[in-house]
Regions:
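Sec-dependent N-terminal signal peptides
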Residues: 13-20
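Compositionally biased regions
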Residues: 8, 19, 57-59
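Bacterial N-terminal signal peptides that target proteins for export
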Residues: 4-13
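Hydrophobic core
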Residues: 21-25
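Glycan-processing catalytic domains of CAZymes
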Residues: 27-301
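Switch/coupling segment of Walker-type NTPase motor domains
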Residues: 1
């Protein structure tokens, strides 16, 4: 990730806040008449640097937390006895659940860092995932996430559908495409997705594949076929750099994505790495000016 000098970062934040202040005086005249985006969830890709995860994402309305993996490289990120050795740093799911942004947990199951390796081990990862599920029955969970991602280039994706069919529900899986506007994306998905499995669609904005507006068109097409509750968009809160690495998206970049996803339930990838407290404050402030109340109020039940 690119390192930004503190002074430059302060200027960026000051500029963003100044623009919001200028807009705030007349925002009540141009508040969106459409439904605001419902920022429900936050992903976390566990690593040693961000364990345990901390943040203020509840200010955006986040109440569901998605640790991408419970187990990766056959080592567990949680301190529960689930039959795997543990990473040097790990967390307790019940303690995680006490955070306001993790009132609900969709538990990521067994995966691998390397996508090709994960795809080649789908059957074994499903078996490991069932073991995790069996060992976490006493923990209240919103559902499970099987962390083997699919795209149309995976010719053997049918085996993923078979693996998903063996796991308890509610269950989620994620999909993406390296094409800006993939043709027959819904047909491809329907060819292997089990009926009771839900889908996270990665918007592809962070990796530079498409614009937020293009992502919305794809999302609408998928939801027309599968239903709005079955397909949820994942907002990539990062941007690719010329060096091939990734940086955190600037607040105004995230805002552009959120505007494109009005009326939709949104999950963000990922909080601990890319959504720091200042970014959250700025986006939450914009949300309040744009829609007339805070994201937290809009999404509370």
């Amino acid at each position: 990730m690119l390192k930004i000098r503190v002074n430059n970062l302060k200027r960026i934040i000051a500029l963003t806040i100044s623009v919001l202040i200028l807009l705030g005086g007349c925002m009540h005249l141009i508040q969106s008449e459409t439904q605001p985006p419902h920022i429900e969830g936050m992903f976390w890709q566990p690593d040693l640097k961000t364990t345990p995860p901390t943040g203020n994402w509840d200010l955006l309305g986040v109440s569901t937390f998605v640790p991408q993996w419970s187990v990766v490289q056959t080592k567990s990120w949680f301190d529960h006895d689930i039959g795997f050795t543990k990473w040097e740093k790990n967390i307790n799911l019940k303690q995680l659940n006490q955070n306001p942004w993790a009132e609900n947990i969709i538990l990521g199951l067994a995966g691998e860092y390397d996508e090709k390796l994960a795809r080649s081990k789908v059957v074994q990862l499903a078996a490991n995932s069932q073991q995790i599920i069996d060992k976490t029955q006493t923990i209240p969970l919103k559902g499970y996430y099987f962390p083997v991602e699919a795209d149309p280039t995976w010719l053997g994706v049918g085996i993923l559908g078979q693996a998903l069919s063996t796991l308890p529900k509610p269950l989620w899986v994620s999909i993406y495409s390296a094409e800006a506007m993939p043709a027959h994306f819904d047909v491809w998905l329907k060819s292997w997705l089990p009926e009771q499995t839900h889908v996270f669609f990665q918007d592809g904005v962070g990796v530079g594949t498409r614009s937020p507006q293009q992502a919305r068109i794809i999302l609408d097409g998928l939801q027309q076929e599968f239903g709005q509750e079955k397909v949820i968009i994942v907002l990539e809160a990062f941007r690719a750099t010329k060096s091939g690495k990734f940086r955190s998206a600037y607040p105004w970049e995230i805002i552009e994505q959120l505007k494109a996803y009005e009326g939709q339930k949104v999950y963000i990838f990922d909080g601990p790495h890319y959504m720091n407290r200042m970014t959250v404050y700025v986006v939450a402030w914009w949300y309040k000016l744009k829609y007339g109340s805070s994201a937290k109020a809009k999404t509370s039940h």
